[in-house]
Amino acid sequence: MSNQIVLGMLMIFLFSSCSVLENKHYVLNNNLNESYFNLNKFKKNYKGMTKEQIIYIFGNPIISDSFNDVFHYIICAEENGFGCHQKILNIFFKKNKVSKLDIR
């Protein structure tokens, strides 16, 4: 009987969505400059980079359009040093390489 209880507990532990090994900490902050990309980050030329390199630099896009090979990111554009105006960065790919950056 005790073996069945131990086996049952082990099965519940193994098949539950909880994990002891994975311990992620998510930090939420109200600082917009840290939450969004800043336009200063785009002074570098990203043309010719692969999708994997762009994901390594910017992280996963908020939306990726697989039919048109476009990644979309939200960026922060400061206006006269006061506040943050949200803009959308569109990164276009041709043959898995960056062909164009568009900020709207």
Swiss-Prot record:
Broad class of where this protein is predominantly found: membrane
Species annotation: Buchnera aphidicola subsp. Schizaphis graminum (strain Sg)
Residues anchoring lipid (S-diacylglycerol cysteine): 18
Places the protein is found: Cell outer membrane
Alphabetically ordered keywords of this record: Cell outer membrane, Lipoprotein, Membrane, Palmitate, Signal
HAMAP family assigned to the protein according to its UniProt record, in alphabetical order: OM_assembly_BamE
Protein name: Outer membrane protein assembly factor BamE
Gene3D superfamilies registered for this protein in UniProt: 3.30.1450.10
Self-association and partners: Part of the Bam complex.
GO biological process terms on file: Gram-negative-bacterium-type cell outer membrane assembly; protein insertion into membrane
GO cellular component assignments: cell outer membrane
Family of this protein: Belongs to the BamE family.
Pfam families: BamE (PF04355)
Main function: Part of the outer membrane protein assembly complex, which is involved in assembly and insertion of beta-barrel proteins into the outer membrane.
Cysteine pairings via disulfide bonds: none
Recorded name of the encoding gene: bamE
Signal peptide range in chain numbering: 1-17
Membrane topology note: Lipid-anchor
Top-level taxon: Bacteria
Lipid modification (N-palmitoyl cysteine), residues: 18
